[in-house]
């Protein structure tokens, strides 16, 4: 028996299916099959696909917040915390190569669909942007903190997109190395 409620199982399955297949190409039937429930039981928990999408976005936000909070506890200084952010590319490289970045692919798809939840999905990037800005401020780059945060977000998204396009793990490793070197310049105050 799973520790997750049926509703939580549905959200977790939808999260994975939206990531792998895309929001538009994932149906109620796909999610119900993944959780092994009837469509009728499914509708008890969610009436619309948009309700599931909102729950998936909230799940991703909660997961990312918990991850950032963990880094705040584990990593002693802002440079180490930023390094943990960069390391996501290495830790998730197999999934990135196969499916792209879960945040980037969802926000891009919702933008293409002109979906009303696009702004909600953008909160995922805003969470990282705000957190990275705080880390660069803690490194002493108050006037440039947001610029540096956006630069790092753009680089990480570019790496994920190109690694997915070229299915190239070596590229990810190479770019992560460059990002670490870039970060070290700012951490040492030589940038």
Region roles according to the model:
Residues 9, 13-51, 55:
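Helix-turn-helix
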Residues 92, 112, 134, 153-171, ...:
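Amphipathic C-terminal alpha-helical segment
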Residues 71, 89-94, 103-112, 138:
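Helix-loop "lid/cap" segments that line or gate small-molecule binding pockets
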Residues 104-108, 143-162, 178, 182:
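Hydrophobic alpha-helical segments that form the core
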Residues 58-65:
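Short, basic, alpha-helical segments at the C-terminal edge of helix-turn-helix-like DNA-binding modules
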Residues 5-6, 13, 148:
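N-terminal positioning helix adjacent to the helix-turn-helix/winged-helix DNA-binding module
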Residues 65, 80-83, 95, 112-140, ...:
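Amphipathic alpha-helical packing segments from all-alpha helical-bundle domains
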Residues 55, 69-99, 149-152:
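Hydrophobic alpha-helical connector segments
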């Amino acid at each position: 028996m799973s520790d997750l409620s049926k509703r939580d199982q549905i959200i977790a399955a939808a999260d994975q299916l939206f990531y792998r297949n895309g929001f538009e190409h994932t149906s109620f039937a796909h999610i119900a099959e993944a959780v092994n429930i009837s469509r009728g039981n499914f509708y008890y928990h969610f009436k619309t696909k948009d309700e599931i999408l909102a729950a998936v976005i909230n799940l991703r936000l909660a997961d990312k917040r918990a991850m950032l909070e963990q880094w705040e506890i584990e990593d002693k200084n802002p440079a180490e915390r930023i390094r943990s952010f960069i390391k996501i590319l290495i830790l998730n490289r197999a999934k990135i190569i196969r499916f792209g970045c879960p945040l980037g692919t969802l926000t891009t798809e919702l933008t293409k669909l002109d979906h009303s939840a696009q702004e909600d999905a953008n909160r995922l990037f805003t969470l990282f942007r705000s957190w990275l800005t705080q880390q660069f401020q803690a490194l002493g780059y108050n006037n440039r903190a947001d610029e540096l945060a956006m630069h790092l977000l753009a680089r990480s998204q570019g790496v994920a997109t190109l690694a997915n396009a070229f299915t190239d793990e070596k590229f990810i490793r190479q770019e992560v190395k460059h990002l670490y070197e870039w970060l070290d310049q700012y951490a040492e105050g030589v940038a």
